[in-house]
Amino acid sequence: MAPLSLNFKDDKKYKGLTTVWLLSALGNSIVKESNNYYSNKSNSTGNISSSTVKKKDIVNISIPKTCDEIQNFENDFSLRYISNLLYGVTICYNKKTEYVLNDLNHLLVQLQKNDVYAFKAKNKSTRINGLNSNNSIIGNKNNNYTWEECVFFDDDPLYDITKVPALEFLNTTLQDNVSFIEEAKSIRRQDYINELSNSNRFELHGDMTNSDAQSNLGSNVRNSFPLDEIPVDVDFNLDLDDIVSHQGTPLGSHSSSQKDGNDFKFNYQGDELVLNFENDNENNSNGGEDTSVENEGPVANLKDYELGLEAQASEEENDLQQKLNTRMQRGHRADVGGQFSKVQFDAKTSYPNEVLKFNHGNYSHLMEKNRIRKLTGQNFLTSNISSLVRSCGEEEFFSTNWLSIFNDFSNIKTSEWDLYPQGFSSVERGRKRAHSLVSTQSSSSTRSHEYGRKSFRNNKNDNYSSDMENDNLLLNLEQINEDLEDGHYIEENSQGNILDFNLNLPPSSFGRSHTRNSTRSSGFNEDIVGALRRRVGPSEQNFAEEDDSSNSCFSDGSQQNLQQDKTNFQDVILDYQTKKFYDYIKERSIVVGRTTRSNPPFKRKMLLVDIIPSRMGEAQTGANFDDVERGVSRQIAASAFLSLLNLATKGMVKLNEYPVADAVTKDLKLRREDEIIVYA
């Protein structure tokens, strides 16, 4: 690049070569367009990355002249420089092509916008003012104008919005096509039928053989029905020239409107309604008795329909008030549910326009009046639970049954409902049966021996059913006494606060025989109670010495315990392993235990060796010394004894020992398994 920058820096003839060389050096990404800079991410050095090539410079480059200049310097430059210049020419040609195509695309978009929004017909005589010669609103290429010229219509200065020229337009169209007159009349008659029947579905009327108009409608008309099946009497000779405004006054009149055939007549529920759209002036000129007699029927019918929603609502209110008065005289307060108003389907869809306009304009006033009437007539009713529970003649019976079902209301008197319909002091917490809804699967991928505050057993050596495990998933929450209405956990200074209950729960590690991540042998993976069940055997000891010693040592305490009540073990919170071990102790007490009455409330007694088998006695006597399955390991024995101490601390079991002859060594002597007595 040095030869170009030094020799041809100020020469205008070689300015194109400089731009081409810059494009080849910087690449195709750095171009300055409309003050937008595109930085080059290639490995460029120095200040080359900050250089830009303007769009104007690229457009001013002449590709043929640049190629001629490169050809003239072919002998002076090396092949490397020539190849770089040709690469720059390629980039320049690519950018110029993009610029040209973008400009053409922009011009095309502008032309399309002008063609759609600002196009005007070249020939003013081809503007559409109604129908063309072919009775077609939309023109075609056979005419002097194209489709684009037919998109917009010129405004008609003679158009009057108060007049509706639709009928004249249709008549002109039908007169030009005489063959379609009969079909048009049939279609118009069918439109009248559809309008009066207030429905657009005619699938139920399948019999079309007796229809006079079916033959004239052609094959394109479907879902029609015979005229005999019309629910109302219709005059099909009604003249559409009588256009009625929104105020109900006729704007125009035709000569045929003075005939009787222009009267709109129909029957509704046995009443004949006649609407005559005659001129008001002629009606006033024909005053007298004849006019009053002729209009007596229509006016009377119109007044009946003007009652509308207000008359119907008043009748319903009167009926409801009579029923309520009758029930109040009899002295019955029950059957309130039968007094609720039912939703009725209003089939009266043939109200005159005056009645409909009156109801629409005074809708809010009528609804407010109707609401006030209902509130005035039903102010003595109370919608509380007493009106739903009680029934006629059997108030106490039904109320007792309902209160037995809804146990939350058992401590509320029936007389208090009227004063405090929502002041219930008891709330069902719903935790007693929550254990049946909890999944037994752990969300962790690592096998866990703890679920919440429960340390559950290993599933490999489980002899219990899954129902027993489900009963203890949440630390036996059914044992937590939450009968708040009985006030077990409400203190004296709590003033009946239902949230003041016992939260003295044990920690999550309570009663666990081992930690979760501890390293243990394969033999310790089995359940402790399962290991004890397989290794226990009947004890050969007797309780001859214990009977005498227990009576002498605990005579005073036993007499005091006889006067005390039994311990309520249901209030004690146990984890799963401890409860399972306690059930195992109860089973062993039934099998090998002896009956005792010296330590109430415990009724059975046994030795510790009956619960936790040991190898100590086997080693001394020599019997079954090779049977290693008789005793248990030290880990299992220590864990079982720890659970036994926890039960003794909670008062679930009681531990005692044989008396020692030497009082000096009483506190220093270690007790054997057959010297510790367990009461359960």
UniProtKB/Swiss-Prot annotation:
Disulfide bonds: none annotated. Keywords: Centromere, Chromosome, Chromosome partition, Meiosis, Nucleus, Phosphoprotein. The record marks 431-432, 453-454 as: Cleavage. Residues 550-560 have a biased composition (Polar residues). GO terms for biological process: double-strand break repair; establishment of meiotic sister chromatid cohesion; meiotic DNA double-strand break formation; meiotic sister chromatid cohesion; protein localization to chromosome, centromeric region; reciprocal meiotic recombination; sister chromatid cohesion; synaptonemal complex assembly. GO terms for molecular function: chromatin binding. It comes from the Eukaryota. The keyword Transferase does not apply. One of its GO terms (cellular component) is condensed nuclear chromosome. The keyword Ubl conjugation does not apply. Changing residue 428 to R: Abolishes cleavage by ESP1 at position R-431. Proteolytically cleaved by ESP1. Phosphorylated by CDC5. CDC5 phosphorylation is necessary for cleavage by ESP1 and subsequent removal from chromosome arms. It is found in: Nucleus; Chromosome; Chromosome, Centromere. Residues 278-297, 431-467, 540-560 are annotated as: Disordered. Induction: During meiosis. Replaces the SCC1 mitosis-specific cohesin to ensure sister chromatid cohesion during meiosis. Is cleaved by ESP1 shortly before the first meiotic division, and dissociates from chromatin, allowing sister chromatids to segregate. Is protected from cleavage by SPO13. Promotes localization of the LINC complex subunit MPS3 on nuclear envelope in mitotic cells. This is Meiotic recombination protein REC8. It comes from Saccharomyces cerevisiae (strain ATCC 204508 / S288c) (Baker's yeast). The lineage of its organism: Eukaryota, Fungi, Dikarya, Ascomycota, Saccharomycotina. The gene is REC8.
